[in-house]
């Protein structure tokens, strides 16, 4: 007695084999075509992967090129900054030395012109004589001092043209018969200037 299960399996295999044979007889190259299609698909996948890889490499190369350019520009800026900083430091040192030299020369020039005045004052104090002799010595010293100021281009501030707040300092306002208002009535302390620069304002009284 034949088992129905085995019979059914054999029947299925027979039918499947017959179908395969018919398919092959109708399309004898079907296996080759399937294989070619598979290879084409794989080839396409490889081409796609290669194109993507190529694009990534080009992008990476471009990025590296830009990075290198930026690095070079940064180094150039650093070098320029260092040069400017060094030049400024050298300029500052030269300027400081020049200022110091000018100040030293100016002090030396003033002292050279003032020391003879001190010498004459010391001589006047050392001489035994009358008050008149002392007065003459002081007058001579004053003239010498005025000459020294003139050599330094320092001049006395004038009060002849009336009160000027830029040049004079009013200590008091007074009434003075026969005088116009805003005139200098008396000078308490002389003022001096060098060019347009006021060294010391004149201390004065001013008329109403």
Curated annotation (Swiss-Prot):
Entries under InterPro entries matching the protein: GrpE, GrpE_coiled_coil, GrpE_head
Single GO biological process annotation from the record: protein folding
Subcellular location as annotated: Cytoplasm
Pfam families documented for this protein: GrpE (PF01025)
GO CC term (a single one): cytoplasm
SUBUNIT field: Homodimer.
Described function: Participates actively in the response to hyperosmotic and heat shock by preventing the aggregation of stress-denatured proteins, in association with DnaK and GrpE. It is the nucleotide exchange factor for DnaK and may function as a thermosensor. Unfolded proteins bind initially to DnaJ; upon interaction with the DnaJ-bound protein, DnaK hydrolyzes its bound ATP, resulting in the formation of a stable complex. GrpE releases ADP from DnaK; ATP binding to DnaK triggers the release of the substrate protein, thus completing the reaction cycle.
Name this protein carries in UniProt: Protein GrpE
Gene responsible for this protein: grpE
